[in-house]
């Protein structure tokens, strides 16, 4: 087995980084399209006369924020020199669990467990934003 030379390792790293960047750029564009579709869907739900449309509107808003947060995560990745900040994943996790509570709130025990998960994520966010762990 031959060992890789430094220039060859850097070349492979550059190729893989380019593939990753192109994939994330493609994902970002797809998410922008979905964000546009969700905007149209929210406008339809907003003017729907049914009573159930209120829950659908709130669920749609949370899904909208999930798309928005994923797009913001991709933008931050490129702005911060190809690095994903941990706190953005925590924001996405909190929003996703809030959406889950809104959609599936039949079992009080499940809602309590989801709420505990949100509390754990908020504590994680607090720790990530503390002076010792903050990178930016």
Swiss-Prot record:
Keywords in alphabetical order: Cell inner membrane, Cell membrane, Membrane, Transmembrane, Transmembrane helix
Location(s), subcellular: Cell inner membrane
Lineage: superkingdom: Bacteria
Entry's transmembrane regions: 15-35, 55-75, 82-102, 108-128
NCBIfam families: PRK02833.1-2, PRK02833.1-3, PRK02833.1-5
Family as reported in the entry's similarity comment: Belongs to the PsiE family.
Name listed for the protein in its UniProt record: Protein PsiE homolog
Organism (species): Enterobacter sp. (strain 638)
Taxonomic classification: Bacteria, Pseudomonadati, Pseudomonadota, Gammaproteobacteria, Enterobacterales
Gene giving rise to this polypeptide: psiE
């Amino acid at each position: 087995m031959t060992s890789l030379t430094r220039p060859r390792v850097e070349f492979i790293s550059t190729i893989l980084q380019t593939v990753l960047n192109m994939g994330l750029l493609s994902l970002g564009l797809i998410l922008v399209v979905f964000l546009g579709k969700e905007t149209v869907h929210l406008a339809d739900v907003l003017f729907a006369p049914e009573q159930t449309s209120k829950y659908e509107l709130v669920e749609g808003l949370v899904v909208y924020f999930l798309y928005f947060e994923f797009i913001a995560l991709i933008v931050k990745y490129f702005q911060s020199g190809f690095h994903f900040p941990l706190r953005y994943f925590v924001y996405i996790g909190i929003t996703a669990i809030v959406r889950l509570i809104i959609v599936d709130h039949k079992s009080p025990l499940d809602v309590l467990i989801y709420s505990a998960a949100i509390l754990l994520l908020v504590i994680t966010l607090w720790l990530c934003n503390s002076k010792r762990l903050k990178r930016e």
